[in-house]
Amino acid sequence: MKHLVFFAALALTSVTPAASAQENLPNQAEAPENILIFEPGFFAAAVPSSALDMVIRIPGFSVSDGASVRGFAGAAGNILINGARPASKADSGTSVLSRTPASRVERIELIRGGAPGIDMQGQSVVVNVILRSEISRQQTVTAQATIFEGGPALPSGSYGFSSSNNGTQWGLELRRIVPTNTSTGVGKSTRRDASGAIIFKEQRRHDFDGGGWRTRGNWSGPVGLGRLEITGGYWLMRYEDELLFSAPGSPERLFTLKNEPSRADLGLRYERALGRTLNLETRLIQAYGWDDFTSRSLGPGFNQQFETDRTAGESIARAVLRWERSEALTWEGGGELAYNFMDTEQSFISNGMPVVLPLASTRVEEVRGEVFGQASWSQSERLRLEAGLRLEHSTIQQSGDASSKRNFFYPKPRLALTFDLHENRQMRLRLERELGQLNFGDFAASSSLPNDQLLGGNLNLRPQQRWISEAVFEQRFDRDGVMTLTLRHDEISDVIDVIPLDGGLTAIGNIGDGTLTRIAANLRLPLRNLGLEQGRLTLNTQYDRSRVTDPTTGDRRAISRVRPFTTSINFEHDVPNRNLRWGLSYLPWSRDPTFTPDQQRTVERRHDVTLFAEYTFENGLAAYISFTKWDDLRLDRDVYSDRMTQVIAFREEQRIDPRDFVQIRLRRTF
């Protein structure tokens, strides 16, 4: 099954229609066929304000900032700026591009399958944003308001400054940030017994509020024989949440949540040439985080409070040496050393009495080292091969309420093949072993009071491993049209899900081996043949089938939090002679299942629609307005009276009409 994807994808090449002419693509200059060049004129009709406005409009590309994991290698996204990723993990590619004025972009390269001097970091497709180096100074001011039906009204905005002077750049940003919550609003909750008889009905009201600040500064320029990049940032947030259930003649049930997280980071990146074909890149990253979390529940017969005080930190040192042996062959090798820690103090009080939780007080530390090597070979202009191996060793030590020390070693090979079948037709194949990183929060206790659930900590967590076989077929047409079909199969070891503990508790843990099979289709269709010269329709569909053995019942089921089906429809139309762009997005349906020993929960969304328009005045002021209607949210819960037999104690159905909201934004660059 692991390699079936490869053969199925190869069969597609015999049934796909011929590609359109190469001259319909963006200006290619002297670029290889696997690198598409997009110059500023390609985006002119949309009047972009930032580099991010340009990148999100590239046909056949979906922005990813990478995974939120420890270390740098597994967290890399698919955005590069001048051939490199940002100096700090916390400063994502989209964040950098959002504060980079569009006028500074010289060109954007869409790299499919690899290119000399480009660190793909396991990505099949990346964009490389090339910035102009001439003297410039720009300031950007943004004012925004997000107004929810029935409240709250959340103001936000930002001020950014950037300067470039013959290779030296610096900038700063101050931003007001606000949270969002897709489940707030009014609705109804109905609880039934196993026979379907109604136990009680309640009205449901969910409110939230909050806000925070984020600041960041950056500098880059020549130092010694190389180039140094420095970035640092800090942000803090306040978030409050209130969920109320009420019914005439019955006591209310109230659940509140308050979280005050903050983060600080500093990143340094230094790159220098050691010769005409040899290049060295080094990185140092330091990050800290603090969380103060309180959750309360109050109702008939219960008064509970769960508190968490958490401090975490990460230190990373990384070096990469690249040797361009020839135009066809590039070697790369290096290493990464990371230290992570997390201190957690938690308490749970129920009806005035402290409740002992497994691993409520704990400190987790990890020392992780990785060495890696990779070779990229272009057999011809149409065939490219990438082969690599990463060797990871880590030691995780836990102290506090319980102690443990464990060592892990995992080899992570990767093989990727890119084949240009025709000028506009490409096949990408990948076989790779990926190692998931453990969430330090899973080592400590946690709670979900509205779902009547307490999770104990787990000393014995192991990283989840995947053997991934993937094939992507890409067909480009009509200048900016593109269709991609993805077939993927994962063989998963040590699946991480929820396991039963003694005393009626549960915890995050490993539940054995599993599989995931994915079929995804994406289409970007230009609408010029329908009379909309700058119109386009984008369709994205993904089907996932996951299977694993339930640790409680022994039955086969899906893996928690894997959506079986997702789809989206987006329409955009640029009207350059009126300095206007408008469009809409539609999400028809999504479903998130969660399986635990004591209950099964599903979150289902239906018919989410966003309509937007943006007008750019002659003086450069851009005015944006959008209306979002979240039509239907369903929260269903089956609670069992017995774990082993999973006899239904009651079923809970929550039907919510989430609050619609309007966003208004003014942005001026000068």
Language-model features: locations:
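Short acidic/polar hinge/loop motifs at secondary-structure boundaries
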Residues: R85-R112, G217
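Outer-membrane beta-barrel signature, preferentially recognizing the C-terminal barrel domain
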Residues: N259-R263, R310, A360-R368, R406, ...
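N-terminal periplasmic accessory domains that precede
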Residues: A51-M54, G93-L97, G122-A143, G157
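Extracytoplasmic beta-strand/coil segments of soluble accessory domains associated
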Residues: L25-A29, L36-I37, L52-K89, G113
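C-terminal beta-signal and adjacent terminal beta-strands/loops
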Residues: Y615-F670
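Face-selective signature of the C-terminal outer-membrane beta-barrel domain
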Residues: R214-M237, L257-S404, D420, L485, ...
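Surface-exposed extracellular loop regions of Gram-negative outer-membrane beta-barrel proteins
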Residues: W290, F341-T344, F348-I349, T395, ...
